[in-house]
A protein has these predicted regions:
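Sec-dependent bacterial lipoprotein signal peptides
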Residues: 1-13
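A residue-level marker of the well-folded mature domains of exported/periplasmic proteins
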Residues: 12-363
Length: 363
């Protein structure tokens, strides 16, 4: 798949093309009016995007699509699969009309998905592919995320890539996205660089990443590590802290994912080489549309949003919407997160980063 241009270009798809499709209610699907309840289950509060972007964007879009009559019943699992299961079951008991779930434990949540199906409640997997009889899936192309990270790292290392010692800091093995991202990264890295250490990171914990990076530094040598493949911005934060505490005079290229504000600031300052920008706006608004369209039986519009399909360990041919991604570096901050109104220059260029911003013409 070709690399996407920018989130601003992608938003045309959400705001223009889909909105232009006429209502196509299916006579076979149960239809409801605008007075609907969308259950939203998000995984944690450590990842900044969920509370700051995903929940507010989904809530706003549901309101827009239902003339203010629809509502979102929201719960955050705070990194506890057991808590998420309890929250899921409560939403079934509350008889919400549809559930959007970003599963902490994709396999473990399958029984809850089945209970929802038995209760006649559609379930849409959000951001991570849950197992069980889900009705649809909306996320980014996670394999492409890894490819973008790996390709950017190889290009940055240039002619020294083949002899470069690289540490891989992968995500939580319980997260189905982790395997896809890792697979994409390895397609670009294997045979191009020397991967000397590989770590999985329980619950995507920055502290675990930091501890593992300290082990890698002790084993490989501070000055012998040419780059670090980090699967997310949170992990990159821990990796960079480990280098700082080890007394590194210069931090080698470190990748990331999510375009968190602190990560964008690290990119500006040069502490972090790149991050993967994924349009929260497009993912969240399309998820809200899919949920509302599913409940209201608007099959033509629903199908227009789910023209891809994916397989899970339990189901095949799941209707899916895969949102493209883009590599964010110093060179395209203005054309991505600023142009898409994710952050303002003022938010990025605080006094601490003012000089770095000026150096790259960000003002």
């Amino acid at each position: 798949m070709a690399l996407a241009a920018s989130g601003s270009a992608l938003s045309l798809t959400a705001c223009g093309v889909i909105d232009g499709i006429g209502g196509g209610d299916s006579s076979e699907a149960p239809k409801k009016g605008d007075d609907i309840t969308v259950g939203l289950l998000l995984p944690d509060k450590d990842t900044a995007r969920f509370e700051k972007f995903d929940y507010p964007l989904i809530k706003k879009e549901v309101g827009t699509l239902t003339d203010g009559k629809g509502k979102v019943e929201y719960a955050n699992a705070e990194a506890s699969p057991d808590r998420q299961s309890q929250q899921f079951q409560k939403m079934i008991e509350d008889q919400v009309d549809v559930i959007l779930v970003d599963a902490l434990d994709a396999k473990g949540i399958a029984s809850d998905v089945q209970k929802a199906k038995d209760a006649g409640i559609p379930v849409i997997a959000y951001d991570r592919l849950a197992q069980g009889p889900i009705d649809a899936y909306v996320s980014h192309d996670n394999e492409l995320v890894g490819e973008v990270q790996g390709r950017a790292l190889v290009e940055e290392l240039g002619s020294k890539a083949a002899s470069s010692k690289v540490v891989m800091m992968n995500g939580d093995p319980a997260d189905p996205n982790t395997g896809l991202v890792k697979e994409g990264a390895l397609e670009e890295l294997e045979g191009e660089v020397n991967i000397v250490k590989r770590y999985d990171t329980d619950k995507w914990s920055p502290e675990v990443a930091k501890a593992n990076m300290k082990k890698a530094i002790a084993s490989v040598g501070l000055n012998n590590i040419a780059a670090v493949y980090s699967a997310s911005d949170g992990l990159a934060d821990g990796v960079i802290d480990a280098f700082k505490e080890a007394g590194a005079s210069k931090i080698p290229p470190v990748t990331g994912q999510d375009a968190n504000l602190d990560a964008v600031q690290r990119v500006v300052s040069g502490e972090q080489f790149m991050t993967v920008y994924k349009s929260f706006l497009l993912e969240a608004t399309n998820a809200a549309k899919m949920a509302v369209y599913k409940v209201q039986g608007r099959d033509i519009e629903f199908d227009a949003l789910t023209q891809s399909s994916v397989d899970s360990p339990t189901d095949e041919g799941i209707p899916a919407q895969l949102v493209p991604v883009v590599a964010l570096t110093k060179s395209n901050i203005e054309e991505t997160v600023i142009q898409d109104d994710v952050y303002t220059v003022k938010q990025i260029c605080t006094p601490e980063y003012a000089a770095d911003c000026a150096a790259i013409g960000l003002n």
